[in-house]
């Protein structure tokens, strides 16, 4: 029997001071965390008899217990609230996805440093630039720097073992420091120019390159002048695309947009007056929230939730909230940095504010349109299969291998809102006859649904199997053996022409065979899920096959176990470079004797 919460008795003893409150259900599960200037006043608003929004009313109906923590002030309440949300991720709070792995551009130490993408803790010695809002934005910057200044981007292990320049040198994306084709002084100058660009000093960099170009032309060094001209032209194109007219400094432009279907926050990162990129966030909104509440929750979680995130000097937002002062004070307490949150802006800053709003609105509408389209396809599938209810979870399996080598089975999961990628799974198939797809599917399904039988994971409403009659029969046998006799099974076989739109479908057994018209929404959903399972299987298979082939030629060498194989490949930067190495070069690798080097060389070069 569920516990009934006595709101009147609770409010009679509730403090009116600032603090944090936690709402629990009858099974002691945390439902919601909130903060308030006045705990009693804020909590009383939940228990009034009328005027609550439907989702808020649903939350209140589940409350069995409320706990409070009094704090010295609002700032302390905000910090405690964010810590609790981050730790427990309550279902009715506005939640951002964990984003600890935002990428940086990393410039290593050393005489010939490398540029690359870095995620995670900053342990390696060197300089870090960013964070960038997306991997796409950082790759764009690295590509530009490689074209303009040819600073190497290869891993140190690869660089250290080169005996001749690689393809990047041939296409003029690197100056070949690995084989002494560039002096340390010239390379250092290219690194300095790259740093100026990453620091946002492109105007100063352009002026410097112009002066150098004129100097080279005066000295009749036309080849050098042409190289500098190309660098300047590249920089100007970037400035036209990325720079805010009249803008400078470090700013994040943030807009929140909310409608009944969800919420979107769009963030544009500007550093040194240069737009690094932008990103959409779709926070989970558990109860009806105003756009200002979404903005306040985003700022708190995004900037307070990650101590390593670099703070700009200013945030430009499209709404105001009473918590903004507490947020800036909390950031000052935690990070020792002053930060301004601006709402009323003019000129270029106002145009960028409006651009962020437009992007947030369009992104949310596109997401909801896709979600509605997907939901309509699910309804069509339910009708075609004669189901009493619209399925909420579909799983599809596929097998991929190369003549039986490195067999991988994939499982993809879809719901009415689209793919549920966190539930995707791959299975490395072992112990079956090479090329036996039925045995491979049997193993994958047995492993997957055996775990579900043991209480791990969720059972789908419909199980799709790519492969037709044989695979469907095998899937049915596995499900019956595990006791899942009520599960809807759907086999998908390619038609005679093997073209999309001509598939033959089998429902539950091979005797219930049917086809759908090419324009059927249900068929389009089936094709989408099948193709995604195929893609996911092929990706896994290629990765497994590549890994196996990298080490297979070393596996039969006595004295070279898994650890030594890994160390060898790491030392040479890959199997290709190891293949090119001489016996003497192999013997220089850590832990490799001359005799063992001879055995390795013989194995690699045997017919």
Swiss-Prot record:
SUPFAM superfamilies: C-terminal UvrC-binding domain of UvrB, GIY-YIG endonuclease, RuvA domain 2-like. One of its GO terms (molecular function) is DNA binding. Keywords: Cytoplasm, DNA damage, DNA excision, DNA repair, Excision nuclease, SOS response. Disulfide bonds: none annotated. It comes from the Bacteria. It is found in: Cytoplasm. GO terms for cellular component: cytoplasm; excinuclease repair complex. Residues 203-238 form the UVR domain. Residues 16-94 form the GIY-YIG domain. One of its GO terms (biological process) is SOS response. CDD domains: GIY-YIG_UvrC_Cho. Belongs to the UvrC family. Interacts with UvrB in an incision complex. The UvrABC repair system catalyzes the recognition and processing of DNA lesions. UvrC both incises the 5' and 3' sides of the lesion. The N-terminal half is responsible for the 3' incision and the C-terminal half is responsible for the 5' incision. This is UvrABC system protein C. It comes from Pseudomonas putida (strain ATCC 700007 / DSM 6899 / JCM 31910 / BCRC 17059 / LMG 24140 / F1). The lineage of its organism: Bacteria, Pseudomonadati, Pseudomonadota, Gammaproteobacteria, Pseudomonadales.
């Amino acid at each position: 029997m569920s516990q009934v919460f006595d709101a009147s008795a609770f409010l009679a003893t509730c403090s009116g001071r600032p603090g944090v409150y936690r709402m629990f259900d009858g099974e002691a599960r945390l439902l919601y965390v909130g903060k308030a200037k006045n705990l009693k006043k804020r909590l009383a608003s939940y228990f009034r008899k009328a005027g609550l929004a439907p989702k808020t009313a649903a939350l209140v109906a589940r409350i069995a217990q409320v706990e409070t923590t009094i704090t010295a002030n609002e700032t302390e309440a905000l910090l405690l609230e964010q810590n609790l949300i981050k730790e427990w991720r309550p279902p009715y709070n506005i939640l951002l996805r964990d984003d600890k792995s935002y990428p940086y551009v990393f410039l290593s130490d050393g005489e010939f440093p490398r540029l690359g993408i870095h995620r995670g803790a900053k342990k390696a010695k060197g300089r870090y630039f960013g964070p960038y809002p997306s991997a796409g934005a950082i790759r764009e910057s690295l590509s530009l720097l490689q074209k303009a200044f040819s600073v190497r981007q290869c891993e140190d292990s690869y660089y250290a073992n080169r005996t001749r320049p690689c393809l990047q040198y041939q296409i003029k994306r690197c100056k070949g420091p690995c084989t002494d084709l560039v002096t340390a002084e010239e390379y250092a100058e290219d690194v300095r120019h790259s740093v100026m660009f990453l620091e946002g000093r492109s105007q100063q960099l352009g002026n410097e390159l112009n002066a150098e170009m004129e100097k080279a032309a005066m000295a009749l060094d036309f080849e050098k002048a042409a190289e500098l001209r190309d660098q300047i032209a590249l920089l100007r194109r970037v400035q036209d695309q990325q720079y805010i007219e009249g803008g400078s400094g470090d700013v994040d432009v943030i807009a929140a947009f909310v409608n009944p279907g969800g919420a979107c926050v769009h963030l544009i990162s500007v550093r040194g007056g240069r737009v690094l990129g932008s990103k959409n966030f779709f926070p989970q909104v558990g109860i009806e929230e105003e756009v200002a509440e979404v903005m306040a929750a985003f700022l708190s979680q995004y900037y307070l939730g990650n101590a390593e995130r670099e703070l700009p000097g200013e945030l430009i937002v499209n709404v105001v909230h009473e918590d903004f002062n507490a947020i800036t004070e909390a950031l000052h307490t935690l990070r020792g940095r002053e930060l301004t949150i601006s709402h009323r802006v003019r000129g270029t800053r106002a145009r960028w504010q409006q651009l962020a709003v437009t992007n947030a609105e369009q992104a949310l509408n596109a997401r909801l349109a896709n979600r509605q389209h997907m939901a309509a396809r699910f309804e069509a599938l339910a009708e075609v299969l004669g189901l009493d209810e619209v399925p909420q979870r579909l799983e599809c399996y596929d097998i991929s291998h190369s003549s039986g080598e490195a067999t991988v089975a994939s499982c993809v999961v879809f719901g009415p809102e689209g793919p549920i990628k966190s539930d995707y799974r791959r299975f490395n198939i072992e112990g079956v006859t090479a090329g036996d797809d039925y045995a491979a599917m049997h193993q994958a399904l047995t492993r997957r649904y055996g775990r579900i039988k043991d209480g791990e994971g969720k059972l789908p409403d419909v199980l799709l199997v790519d492969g037709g009659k044989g695979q469907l029969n095998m899937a049915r046998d596995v499900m019956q053996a595990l006791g899942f006799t009520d599960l809807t099974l759907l086999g998908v076989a390619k038609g005679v022409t093997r073209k999309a739109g001509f598939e033959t479908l089998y429902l539950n057994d091979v005797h219930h065979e049917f086809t759908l018209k090419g324009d059927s929404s249900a068929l389009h959903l089936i094709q989408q899920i099948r193709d995604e399972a195929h893609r996911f299987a092929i990706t896994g298979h290629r990765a497994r096959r590549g890994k196996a082939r990298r080490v297979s030629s070393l596996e039969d060498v006595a004295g070279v176990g898994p650890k030594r194989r890994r160390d060898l490949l790491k030392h040479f930067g890959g199997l290709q470079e190891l293949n090119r190495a001489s016996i003497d070069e192999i013997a220089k690798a850590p832990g490799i004797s001359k005799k063992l080097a001879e055995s390795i060389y013989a194995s690699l070069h045997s017919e």
